[in-house]
């Protein structure tokens, strides 16, 4: 902690960043932004790739602690390991900024004043997905039988974002008084190829019954789109398709009418907030426990401005 005080006086700091996996599209955008903002503040930044393995990430955290970094920014491989991560770091007094994957509040409480979370509220992203469907011409009920029949492509089952998006996308429909029927929920673990295969199977099994394909992220939605097109279906005419992340390829598909919509997980807003929280820790200022960054609904009307 003494080093943090010295760092604050000189305005410089060493920041260690642990990303769950460099191969993740969204986290690549995020870490590029984050590195830029931290360096603009005059901090030296080291970013490590957890390679989607918690043991690897834990070793990286220990290395950063040995090096005496001033602040740790952590995008945990497993949110279920967040308490262990805090217990590893807390004896050193090093502040932690958790990003993008939300730990339980109890974890943040256990290291009060030295630990915060910067992210988007995944409930909102799910709600926005449901609203995208309610804003379509048929409100999701393409065949007019009085109910919205859908399939769901889900991310990592342990990930709170996946859980909330699955729940709140449908809650938006039922809150609007709609009757819904789930044909099947597929566990596609955020993966494009897995989703492509599952949606191909679903389309051959359920055919025209499928009115909406909900995907917890855009990678899975892009996989779903390939199978929808191969099956001779047309998004906007006989099926609706929504994702989350606003990846460039997905946004282009929204512009082209091949996806109903997506939800922007605002990497710029989140990276800005994470860098700001880091600066507060370096300066020894008061840090809030949560910093929430809004999602943005991306439709054909506004999509062009979100193409990166």
Predicted regions and their residues:
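A residue-level marker of the well-folded mature domains of exported/periplasmic proteins
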Residues: 1-308
């Amino acid at each position: 902690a003494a080093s943090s005080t010295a760092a604050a006086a000189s305005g410089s700091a060493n920041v260690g960043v642990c990303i769950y996996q460099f191969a993740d599209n969204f986290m690549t955008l995020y870490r590029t932004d984050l590195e830029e903002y931290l360096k603009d503040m005059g901090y030296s930044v080291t970013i490590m790739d957890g390679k989607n393995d918690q043991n690897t990430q834990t070793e990286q955290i220990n290395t950063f602690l040995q090096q005496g970094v001033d602040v740790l920014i952590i995008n945990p491989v497993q949110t279920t390991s967040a308490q262990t991560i805090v217990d590893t770091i807390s004896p050193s007094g090093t502040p932690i900024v958790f990003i993008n994957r939300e730990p339980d509040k109890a974890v943040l409480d256990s290291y009060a004043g030295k630990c915060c979370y910067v992210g988007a509220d995944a409930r909102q992203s799910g709600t926005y997905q449901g609203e995208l469907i309610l804003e379509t011409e048929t409100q999701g009920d393409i065949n007019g039988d009085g109910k919205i029949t859908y399939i769901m492509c889900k991310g990592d089952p342990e990930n709170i974002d996946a859980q909330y998006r699955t729940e709140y996308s449908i809650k938006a429909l039922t809150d609007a008084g709609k009757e819904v029927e789930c044909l099947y929920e597929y566990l596609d673990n955020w993966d494009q190829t897995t989703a492509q295969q599952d949606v191909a199977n679903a389309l051959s099994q359920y055919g025209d019954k499928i009115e909406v394909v909900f995907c917890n992220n855009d990678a899975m939605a892009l996989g779903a789109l390939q199978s929808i097109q191969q099956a001779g279906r047309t998004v906007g005419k006989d099926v609706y398709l929504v994702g989350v992340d606003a990846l460039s390829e997905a946004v282009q598909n929204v512009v082209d009418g091949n996806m109903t919509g997506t939800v922007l997980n605002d990497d710029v807003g989140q990276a800005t907030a994470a860098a700001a929280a880091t600066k507060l820790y370096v300066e020894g200022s008061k840090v809030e426990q949560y910093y929430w960054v809004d999602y943005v609904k991306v439709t054909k009307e506004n999509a062009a401005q979100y193409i990166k």
